[in-house]
Amino acid sequence: MEGFSPPINTAQVDAKTKLDEKVDYSNLPCPVLYEELNREATMALKPELFEGFRLDYNKSLNQKFFLSHSILMGPTEVPNPTPSSEIIKIPTANYDFGAGFIDPKLYLIGRITTDGRLNARAKFDLTDNFSVKANALLTDEEDKSQGHLVIDYKGSDYRTQLQLGNNSVYAANYIQHVTPHLSLGGEAFWLGQQLMSGVGYAARYETDKTVASGQIASTGVAVMNYVHKVSEKLSFATDFIYNYLSRDVTASVGYDLITRQSRLRGKVDSNGVVAAYLEEQLPIGLRFLLSAEVDHVKKDYKFGFGVNAF
């Protein structure tokens, strides 16, 4: 009839909208580093747990230079000389001193401990796309010193790395966005000391609310992670690790809760391990830390508390 228009088919409108929203494959985003594919799950499921008392003090001397002091007092696990599965711990205390220089194109960070360990890291951005990173660990223990060099190149929608280490360690990886949400990558490595080589493959899918990633390597390990962001303050994470050579399986689930003055992370895994980590911001320039881990199978219990001053 005149004056009436035909009803609108919403399905046809949605289909037309999707066709109109064509993907510009020449303008895809740059992916995360290959080694950081699981960073969201790692942050939620693997906080820096500790046992005993920990005190950290960081002092900025100017906008680029800072000093740090750290004290850790608590038990340390040592190998059991008997066939018993009992865990042996001895009381220890350790202090480390650190210094750092941070610039938009260069950072240098070094730490030395009372047990004779020197840890140094450096990164230099040669251009906006090309950077070099170096890590070194020096110790008086035989065959424990390490050196690692990473050359990183970042393209518009891809990243690639070349890694060189002592003991004839060579590795290379490449990752690229193939759609606005999906990135695919692979790696190859050679371990000269173990006379072992291998390859690996990875995929990562991310949206505003979810991140899913998976990796598999010829060494026999497959890893899958999923993180769901419920709100700006709360997210849940889970991971699944399977070694198809030894048939070992580990699964874990956890959460990450961020409030105005605190952050609480916790997890439980299929090995019977329950852990929690709390960071509480105090109004006087201090951060209070609580760390707890319970291994019901091994009957191992760890508790720690600390203070971070800045």
Swiss-Prot record:
**Subcellular location, record wording:** Mitochondrion outer membrane
From its record, what is one biological process in GO terms?
monoatomic ion transport
The PTM N-acetylmethionine maps to: 1
Q: Give GO cellular component annotations, separated by semicolons.
A: mitochondrial outer membrane; pore complex
Residue intervals passing through the bilayer: none
Q: What is its induction behaviour?
A: Up-regulated after antimycin A or rotenone treatments.
InterPro entries registered for this protein in UniProt: Porin_dom_sf, Porin_Euk/Tom40, Tom40
Membrane topology (UniProt): Multi-pass membrane protein
GO molecular function terms attached to this record? porin activity; protein transmembrane transporter activity
Q: In which tissues is it expressed?
A: Expressed in roots, flowers, young cotyledons and leaves.
- Keyword annotations from UniProtKB, A to Z: Acetylation, Ion transport, Membrane, Mitochondrion, Mitochondrion outer membrane, Porin, Protein transport, Transmembrane, Transmembrane beta strand, Transport
Query: Pfam families, from UniProt?
Result: Porin_3 (PF01459)
**Gene3D superfamilies linked:** Porin
Superkingdom of the organism of origin = Eukaryota
Give the primary localization class.
mitochondrion
Q: How does it assemble?
A: Forms part of the preprotein translocase complex of the outer mitochondrial membrane (TOM complex) which consists of at least 6 different proteins (TOM5, TOM6, TOM7, TOM20, TOM22/TOM9 and TOM40). Present in a large lipid-enriched complex called mitochondrial transmembrane lipoprotein (MTL) complex made of proteins located in the two mitochondrial membranes, including the TOM complex and the core components of the MICOS complex and containing at least digalactosyldiacylglycerol (DGDG). Binds to MIC60.
Q: Of which family is this protein a member?
A: Belongs to the Tom40 family.
This chain's function reads: Central component of the receptor complex responsible for the recognition and translocation of cytosolically synthesized mitochondrial preproteins. Together with TOM22 functions as the transit peptide receptor at the surface of the mitochondrion outer membrane and facilitates the movement of preproteins into the translocation pore. Directly involved in the pore formation.
| Record-given protein name | Probable mitochondrial import receptor subunit TOM40-2
